UniProtKB/Swiss-Prot annotation:
The keyword Transmembrane does not apply. Keywords: Glycoprotein, Host cytoplasm, Magnesium, Metal-binding, Nucleotide-binding, Phosphoprotein, RNA-binding. O-glycosylated. This is Non-structural protein 5.
Length: 198
């Protein structure tokens, strides 16, 4: 039995994240979203990452976001996402710019300036071949020894039928006494033949 696995090339996953500043894709959806407080999320992820990495982990709290931390000056752009806890978020698109004040607005549009392109290729080959060869030995065709058959009916009168051979009198006056002794003698012969063969 042989097992061979041939992997011509391992799974190669190549991902490229790129920024496209010139064109922006606007997708519109309709639905509701629940927020706890009114907040704005800025799409400028690089500046937000720099800010979050500059703080110690103990100082980061729920108030650290792009809009409600006074130490950072993130401009709320026209394509920022606004959530309102009271009214929810309606995902209807709007091409107008967002108001910068705290006026309730339940319209959201998404503008994606980043694109993710992923490519995964899997080229592999698995071959399984099972070959079992039976080696025939010379002794396989050799005839087996045939031991003498034990016949249940034996009419030979060669056996002694006295009480000394009857296993302490357990088989006295039994109608199968002759067959019992014949069987016992045959078993002794078979046992002796087995011992000689070994």
């Amino acid at each position: 039995m042989s097992l061979s696995i041939d992997v011509t090339s391992l799974p190669s996953i190549s991902s490229s994240i790129y920024k496209n500043e010139s064109s922006s894709t606007t997708s519109t959806l309709s639905g509701k979203s629940i927020g706890r407080s009114e907040q704005y999320i800025s799409p400028d992820a690089e500046a937000f990452n720099k800010y979050m990495l500059s703080k110690s982990p103990e100082d980061i709290g729920p108030s650290d976001s792009a809009s409600n931390d006074p130490l950072t000056s993130f401009s709320i752009r026209s394509n920022a996402v606004k959530t309102n806890a009271d009214a929810g978020v309606s995902m209807d698109s709007s091409t107008q710019s967002r108001p910068s004040s705290n006026v309730g607005c339940d319209q959201v549009d998404f503008s994606f300036n980043k694109g993710i392109k992923m490519n995964a290729n899997l080229d592999s080959s698995i071959s399984i071949s099972t070959n079992s060869k039976k080696e025939k030995s010379k002794n396989e065709h050799k005839s087996r020894k045939h031991y003498p058959k034990i016949e249940a009916e034996s009419d030979s009168d060669d056996y002694v039928l006295d009480d000394s051979d009857s296993d302490d009198g357990k088989c006295k006056n039994c109608k199968y006494k002759r067959k019992y002794f014949a069987l016992r003698m045959r078993m002794k012969q078979v046992a002796m033949q087995l011992i000689e063969d070994l």
